[in-house]
């Protein structure tokens, strides 16, 4: 089942450039996993980054985190931060929840029927 995580990274003083470099690396690693539907990263304030990640399945989430190319940059991102806040929308399985627990994830309710993957999604659609 699809789920989405929203992350807020509060970046340590003097670590923004390193953080952005590792963030760019992780976005490239994401492209190796078609089950990672979307990554969105923005910087709404100085020393703050917010991400939205959408995963098609629990397997795609775990494969993405298990990718050795991303493990170093992810660890560096965590080290560059004073605080990381993770919220999850959807219903990941027990194994994914165990991984997410390491990030102190909280689970949020979603309005009924409001978070689904379109079963006939077409990235080339003009409508």
Report the location of each language-model feature.
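Hydrophobic beta-strand positions in extracellular immunoglobulin-like domains
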Residues: 9-11, 55
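An amphipathic, aromatic/His-enriched active-site/gating alpha helix that lines ligand/cofactor pockets
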Residues: 28-37, 54-109
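Basic/polar N-terminal segments that are highly enriched at the extreme N-terminus
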Residues: 1-2, 116-127
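Active-site-flanking beta-strand signature of metal-NTP-handling nucleotidyl enzymes
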Residues: 3-9
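Short amphipathic alpha-helical segments
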Residues: 11-38, 69-73, 126-127
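Short hydrophobic/aromatic-rich beta-strand segments that constitute the beta-sheet cores
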Residues: 50-51
């Amino acid at each position: 089942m699809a789920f989405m995580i929203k992350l807020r990274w509060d970046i340590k003083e003097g670590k923004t450039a390193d953080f952005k470099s590792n963030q760019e690396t992780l976005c490239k690693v994401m492209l190796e996993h078609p089950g990672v539907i979307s990554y969105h990263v923005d910087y709404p304030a100085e020393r703050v980054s917010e991400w939205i990640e959408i995963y098609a399945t629990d397997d795609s989430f775990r494969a993405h985190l298990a990718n050795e190319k991303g493990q170093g940059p992810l660890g560096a991102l965590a080290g560059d931060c004073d605080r990381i806040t993770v919220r999850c929308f959807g219903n990941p399985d027990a194994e994914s929840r165990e991984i997410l627990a390491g990030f102190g994830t909280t689970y949020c309710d979603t309005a009924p029927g409001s978070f689904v993957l379109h079963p006939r999604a077409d990235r080339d659609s003009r409508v």
